[in-house]
């Protein structure tokens, strides 16, 4: 035995080092939440029911809505590059977020195929252990249904992307609607921007996948052009048609530096106004321009910029999407829908 260890000492030490690094990297995917300041709750609408006081006749596009990017990437390896949130999806809803960025892929186990949560090459897991099971679509939907049942004044925007380009698009759509059809009355699946009255207590499907099965009612078409270039451009956001009438403006420069991202984010806040027929998505999230992404380090800077940016009262800024969302960030965004207490 001693001879074996002597002869293989280098290999054994290397294997142990790699194993420890794997454990450390994955453990980092579940801790280190960005601290949020204590806020005066009397100044804010309830995080669980802030939509309650918005008029029924308001289009969901004409509301300032807090959202999270890669919403399920809480427990994921490697955490440094792929972790984008510190709160579970259930906690995000409780803390005021209403737009969820859902990345799914077709997965398999002994019981068959299912849709599991992923971020790029990483699988989003239920708990902060490398041995924890992968998050599944049905489990997260149950959490959302429970939230909406408890808070029927609210709606959840559910933006679904098939993250794996190798997936069979027909199977992906079939699995997705197998889950949706189990509780179809809780969904808004049409291709027109709805009024809030039509979607209270429901999930609004936003589609970033092909309707390969020609189901027809498969939600609003949110298949915007990829914005992964690192180069600065004169027009940093892109417009597409939702249904021939309504428009979608998106700023998602996810490979920009923090400085570039700050500029394009604020530029869109100033220059692209959402309204009844114009939906806007303004991503504050970025992996950065390095070979390895650093979402958390970038979010610590960019989220502070958002919190120190004055948002006018009774003004719609559309949907603002962040990494490492906190209650304070959600409140800062959604309170722009209302008059200031001092006004």
PLM region descriptions:
Residues 13-26:
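Hydrophobic membrane-insertion alpha-helices, especially the h-region
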Residues 95-100, 151-157, 200-202, 275-277, ...:
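Loop/turn elements at helix/coil->beta-strand transitions in domains of secreted/extracellular proteins
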Residues 181-314:
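Surface-exposed substrate-engagement region within the catalytic domains
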